[in-house]
């Protein structure tokens, strides 16, 4: 299993727009083969920090996800709403 944590530091006046556009991404992604879970989470202490937490069956499923139309159209747009570059970490399950 592969887990991805993609943290975005969103401009204060763009948080709602980010969430609305992310909704399209989540709705399409959870239907993909190999997607175990995929959601957007908001930091309880700083509402401008929005984080996608994803679980994939394997690396192949994750790589296929990156070729989808919704990924290629939504992700670049979401990055324009960030006030600074985010953090992207990928993990493999050990135990």
Enumerate the language-model features and the residues they cover.
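Residues at secondary-structure transition points
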Residues: 13, 20, 47, 65-72
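N-terminal first-folded block
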Residues: 3-30
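Glycine-rich beta-strand-turn "strand-cap" elements at beta-sheet edges
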Residues: 2, 40-48, 76-95
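An amphipathic, aromatic/His-enriched active-site/gating alpha helix that lines ligand/cofactor pockets
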Residues: 24, 28-37, 55-89
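Short, well-ordered beta-strand segments in beta-rich or mixed alpha/beta enzyme
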Residues: 2-8, 39-66
